[in-house]
Amino acid sequence: MQTQPKVIMFTTPTCSFCNSAKRYLREKNIRFTEVDVSRDISAARDLQRRTGQTGVPVILINNRPIVGFDRPKINQMLNIRG
């Protein structure tokens, strides 16, 4: 049995790329934890410390960051075909 990777997505409510990324992961039945950095300042600081990024979305897959909604990289890291 393959364990599901740990996926955390840092977002804001007004980010259209965040909404697209969330929709994509849901379509692929990938469970993820969403962190709204506009409401959680400590999470925003943590995001910047971990990745050097202040923009969203940033998706952590098993603690490896993907900056932006980079579908090919998401597919590669989650072994999603097509």
Where are these regions (language model features)?
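A short, hydrophobic beta-strand/beta-hairpin element that forms part of a small beta-sheet core
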Residues: 57-67
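Short alpha-helical
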Residues: 16, 42, 73
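Short Fe-S-cluster ligation motifs
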Residues: 42-58
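Thiol-based oxidoreductase modules, predominantly thioredoxin-like and allied folds used
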Residues: 31-43
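Thiol-/selenol-based redox modules, centered on thioredoxin-like
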Residues: 74-82
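Local sequence-structure signature of Cys/Sec-based thiol-disulfide redox active-site neighborhoods
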Residues: 1-28
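A structural signal for short, well-ordered beta-strand elements
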Residues: 11, 33-36, 67
